[in-house]
């Protein structure tokens, strides 16, 4: 789907459209079924039918927009049929893959570790933003939803633009600059919080701008590091390592709140996770290949 010269744009466009498409659906559901009572087609909140129908429409939306993947996207055929393995043999294969990466491509393994950390920090930004907005800045539920919509729209557009910058400069440069900007924005939210809600609107959205570009650039950067012929395996490890450290941001947030005494201190916990991930990223040496562009 991409060449080395267009990998950033393709990844950024795909990830950015995911943000924008999700917001379009969310807006339809909020305007059509969640906020009004009754909503479209006379659906009411009695028995939570508006929520039920929203879930059904979400499933239909997913199915419809998944169809092009099955019918229009070319796929590189597998070299050979993979044998069916049991649960425990799958774990053995996982550790065998990690051991093989240590010997064959240490930089790929280092990046998997770094990205797992900062991606959990990114998840923490969206997970706890609503909590901080409500408890520390007095946002009501409607304002939190409006902020979330604005954050996703901005991040979607920024992700598409970030892909272009990635092709012009480098994926690692985009990730590093974005992480620096996010940490800066979060610290400013913490420091300037006494000035009022405009601080969260301004610097919270500033941080949200850079979430998508990091996610997109992380994916395309990994594609350039993967040893030829191991694309599916390594992207599987990419997903696995991300889930393996998914406790980091919640733990850091909880610890910071416990130490500081208010939810506002949780921002520093999330910023710390992002900072650690960025430091680990800086230790990864760039040795890209073009294995995914065959």
Regions from the PLM with identified roles:
Residues 11-33, 239-249:
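Glycine-rich segments within core transmembrane alpha-helices of 12-TM secondary carriers
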Residues 1-2, 213-226:
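Intracellular juxtamembrane helix-capping segments at the cytosolic ends
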Residues 74-112:
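Juxtamembrane intracellular "pre-TM" segments in multi-pass secondary transporters
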Residues 180-194:
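C-terminal ends and interior cores of transmembrane alpha-helices
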Residues 157-171, 257:
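Helix-to-loop junctions at the C-terminal end of transmembrane segments
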């Amino acid at each position: 789907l991409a060449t080395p010269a267009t990998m950033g744009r393709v990844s950024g466009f795909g990830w950015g459209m995911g943000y924008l498409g999700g917001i379009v659906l969310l807006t339809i559901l909020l305007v059509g079924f969640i906020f009004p009572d009754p909503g479209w087609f006379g659906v009411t909140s009695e028995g939570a039918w508006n929520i039920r129908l929203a879930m059904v429409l979400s499933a239909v939306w997913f199915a419809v927009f998944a169809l092009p993947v099955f019918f229009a996207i070319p796929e590189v055929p597998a070299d050979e049929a993979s044998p069916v393995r049991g649960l425990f043999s799958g774990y053995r294969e996982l550790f065998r893959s990690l051991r093989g990466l240590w010997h064959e491509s240490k930089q790929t393994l280092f990046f998997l570790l770094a990205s797992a950390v900062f991606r959990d920090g990114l998840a923490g930004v969206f997970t706890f933003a609503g909590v901080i907005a409500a408890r520390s800045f007095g946002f009501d539920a409607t304002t939190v939803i409006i902020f979330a919509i604005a954050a996703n729209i901005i991040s979607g557009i920024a992700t598409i633009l970030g892909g272009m910058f990635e092709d012009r400069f480098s994926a690692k440069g985009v990730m590093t600059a974005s992480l620096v900007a996010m940490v800066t924005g979060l610290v400013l939210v913490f420091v300037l919080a006494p000035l009022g809600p405009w601080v969260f609107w301004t610097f919270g959205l500033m941080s949200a701008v850079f979430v998508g570009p990091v996610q997109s650039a992380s994916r395309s950067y990994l594609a350039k590091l993967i040893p030829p012929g191991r694309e599916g395996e390594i992207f599987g490890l990419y997903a696995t390592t991300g889930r393996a450290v998914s406790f980091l941001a919640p733990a850091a947030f909880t610890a910071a709140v416990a130490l500081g005494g208010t939810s506002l201190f949780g921002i520093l916990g999330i910023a710390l996770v992002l900072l650690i991930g960025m430091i680990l990223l800086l230790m990864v040496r760039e040795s890209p290949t073009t294995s995914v562009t065959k």
